[in-house]
Amino acid sequence: MKAGFLLDVNVLIAMAWPTHRDHQKVHEWLARHARDGWATCPLTQTSFVRILSNPAFSANALTPTDALTLLQANLAHPAHRFWADEVSMIDSLKPLAQKLAGHQQVTDAYLLGLAIHKRGKLATMDRAVRTLLPDKNPERDFVVLI
């Protein structure tokens, strides 16, 4: 199996939340790409539980326990891989630091750095992630927009 795709939290949420506007699009993408493997990491898993259990996310927000149960059910997929945080924040941001323009990019930059470190790709619906790398940088191929 290839290194696969690290799913950004926006992809994880759309995958698991049936009323999410991108639920169908993410499932169609996964149907084409899941065979290459897909991954989560502690940061994406934590963010998933935090967001789905936040009443500001949905009037139907889950309890943290229910969000964990939903996460666990999705992670049972045979193509799922867990990527440990094997690279420090500082090391993962080194190639991206010059392009960081604000605090909202820090998490995306870390996830991209982890994907590069693992020789996988970051699958996201956030087009701004590609701006973390210069236009002609071959590492832009490490970002897959869904």
Model-derived features: where do they sit?
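Short, well-structured N-terminal submotif of metal-dependent ribonuclease cores
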Residues: 1-40, 52-69, 137
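Amphipathic coiled-coil/heptad-repeat helices and related helical stalk/stem segments
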Residues: 26, 107-108
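A generic structural signal for well-ordered alpha-helical segments
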Residues: 33, 74-75, 115
